[in-house]
Structures are given as structure tokens and as C-alpha cells.
Design a protein with these regions (language model features):
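C-terminal output helix
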Residues: 2-12
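Residue-level recognition of oxygen-bearing side chains
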Residues: 4, 30, 179
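Generic leucine side-chain signal with a strong bias for well-ordered alpha-helical environments
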Residues: 8, 15-16, 35, 93, ...
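The C-terminal output helix
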Residues: 13-26
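Signal-transmission linkers at sensory-effector interfaces
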Residues: 24-34
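Surface-exposed, interaction-prone regions with an acidic/low-complexity signature
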Residues: 33-36, 45
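Metal-dependent catalytic cores of enzymes that make or break cyclic nucleotides
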Residues: 40-209
Length: 209
């Protein structure tokens, strides 16, 4: 039966409210993405790191045949993965000397802080486990939850590999960068040391050669 005028008006208003809400959520996500990039730009040694990690993680996801949705998710996660560092003081993040145990504990909180920052946005819910768990280790010695092996979400395992790789081929205040070939070789040599998923690491090295 045809809509009554008042019913139609109510439905239109509801749709407009939903559209406005979606636009606000999209804007909030854009703010977080922009904030993540801006956070790095303060430090010449990390500038561009997250964007590179996002792009290379997506490329690797394609290489191993993950679905398009997961390719898009891991690219976004790569850009945002260190957003939690906004809650860590610059005097700790940019310290060139040896970190104290307390400072290390502060830095290790960035994964949990990042998850909390992104949690209110439904559109980012799929990447929350990647943000929280990208510093877990295959042997269970990582943080924040000490997950082991396949308990760690596959996209967090991917990000862990790519994050380390980009750090190795980029300049840092405490060391010079190494070549892509040397970084891939070094990671392959350390594949059984317990940091990464050894099968995924082999695939990554294969892609980089």
C-alpha cells in the first residue's frame, strides 16, 4: 500500500540522519589516518614508515592470495598501526640512548592505546586485532597478550614482518639502513628465532627477491 505522507517524511529524515552519521564516521576515520601520518612526520627517521608498511603489506596480501577486503584492511592497518604512539612522550620515542625498563613498558603500551583510539569507529573494527597484536611473536614472547603461533591473527603476523623489514631498510638515528637484499637475507636467516611466522616469512622473502 502507498506510504502516507508523514511516514515518508519520517523515513526520509531517518535516511538523512544515517547519511549524516556515516559522513561523520568517514570524517573521523580520515582524521585518524591523517593523524597517524602527521605523528610520523615530526621525526625524519620515521616519516613515511606507516604508509610504506601499509602499501607493502597490501602487496604481500595480494602475493599470498588474501581476498580484496583483507588487502584493503591491512593497508589501512599499516597506516594506522602506530597511532598509539601519540600517547607516548617524544622524550621516550626519540631517545637515542638505551631505554630503561619503565620506558620500554611505556612504548609497549602503544598497541593497546592504538586499539582504544580506533575502537569507537565501527569502520575500523576489522583492523583492531591487527593494531593490538602486530608486536606479538610466533614464540609467544611478544606483547601485549603473549599470543603464540596461529593464535596471532594472520594480518597481524604479516604486519609484524613488513614493519620490521621497513625499519631495517630505513635510516634510524642509531644505525644506517641496509639494502633490500640484505634485509631479506637477514630475516630469512632469523626465521627460526621465534619472532615471525616462518611460513609467511619464507613467502615474504620470495616476494622481495
Amino acid at each position: 500500500k502507498p506510504f502516507k505522507s508523514i511516514e515518508l517524511t519520517t523515513k526520509v529524515r531517518s535516511l538523512l540522519k544515517l547519511k549524516k552519521l556515516q559522513e561523520e564516521l568517514d570524517h573521523s576515520e580520515s582524521v585518524i589516518l591523517t593523524l597517524a601520518v602527521a605523528l610520523e612526520s615530526k621525526d625524519p627517521y620515521t616519516k613515511g614508515h606507516s604508509e610504506r608498511v601499509g602499501s607493502l603489506s597490501a602487496e604481500f596480501a595480494v602475493f599470498i592470495g588474501l581476498p580484496e577486503k583483507e588487502q584493503a584492511s591491512i593497508k589501512k592497518a599499516g597506516i594506522i598501526h602506530d597511532i598509539g604512539k601519540i600517547g607516548i612522550g617524544d622524550h621516550i620515542l626519540h631517545k637515542s640512548g638505551v631505554l630503561t625498563k619503565e620506558e620500554i613498558r611505556f612504548i609497549e603500551q602503544h598497541t593497546v592505546i592504538g586499539e582504544k583510539i580506533c575502537k569507537p569507529l565501527y569502520s575500523l573494527s576489522v583492523i583492531l586485532p591487527i593494531i593490538r597484536h602486530h608486536h606479538e611473536r610466533w614464540d609467544g614472547e611478544g606483547f601485549p597478550d603473549g599470543l603464540k603461533g596461529e593464535q596471532i591473527p594472520i594480518m597481524a603476523r604479516i604486519l609484524s614482518i613488513v614493519d620490521t623489514f621497513d625499519a631495517m631498510v630505513s635510516e634510524r638515528p642509531y644505525r644506517r639502513p641496509i639494502s633490500i637484499e640484505k634485509a631479506a637475507k637477514k630475516m630469512e636467516e632469523e626465521k627460526n628465532f621465534g619472532q615471525w611466522d616462518p611460513v609467511l616469512l619464507e613467502k615474504f622473502v620470495e616476494m622481495m627477491r
